[in-house]
A protein has these predicted regions:
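N-terminal signal-anchor transmembrane alpha helix
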Residues: 3-44
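Interfacial loop-to-transmembrane junctions
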Residues: 102-126
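Core segments of transmembrane alpha-helices
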Residues: 65-77
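Hydrophobic transmembrane alpha-helices of multi-pass small-molecule transporters
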Residues: 17-20, 101-104, 128-131
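Juxtamembrane boundary at the C-terminal end of a transmembrane helix
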Residues: 130-139
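Structural signature of hydrophobic alpha-helical transmembrane segments
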Residues: 87-97
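Juxtamembrane helix-break-helix junctions at the cytosolic face
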Residues: 77-89
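Short membrane-interface loop/juxtamembrane segments of multi-pass integral membrane proteins
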Residues: 43-66
Length: 139
């Protein structure tokens, strides 16, 4: 079997944890500065919009993003592992993960358009191709 397609999936899992830690490391000090008495009872992350600095919230926005579209990536990789995959699939998986990590860093640290949108569109296009590859592998 070609290079392991599970490796880029595992890298994205670890990257998601890195973003969780980055989010916590920036939100914690921001919340201490704000004072939790300013939060409504049962407040959630989205309730922090406008209360803590935008650049702190960007990390949370990206963490949430990593729990959305990448679920399709994980499903496609799983299907390919079960149905068979080739070097192109592994390359696409790595490309998707690399672009998603670059997108994460950009969104969390800079968050300017159009670069962020371009990174998202590129990763989405790669994911769409990988999803079609997964479908074809099942036929």
């Amino acid at each position: 079997m070609p290079a392991n397609i599970l490796t880029p999936a595992a890298v994205l899992v670890v990257w998601t944890i890195v973003m969780l830690i980055w989010m916590g490391a920036t939100r914690g000090p921001a919340l201490r500065k704000l004072g939790t008495d300013k939060l409504k009872h049962g407040a959630r992350g989205q309730d922090l919009e406008g209360l803590i600095p935008d650049d702190v919230n960007w990390k949370a926005h990206n963490y949430v993003n990593l729990l959305e579209q990448p679920t399709i990536f994980y499903a496609a990789v799983f299907i390919l592992v079960l149905s068979g995959y080739g070097p192109l699939d592994t390359l696409l998986a790595w490309l998707y993960v690399i672009v998603r990590i670059v997108h994460s860093v950009w969104q969390a640290a800079v968050n300017r358009q159009p670069a962020r949108a371009i990174l998202f569109l590129v990763s989405t296009a790669v994911l769409a191709i990988l999803a079609v590859e997964a479908l074809l592998a099942t036929l």
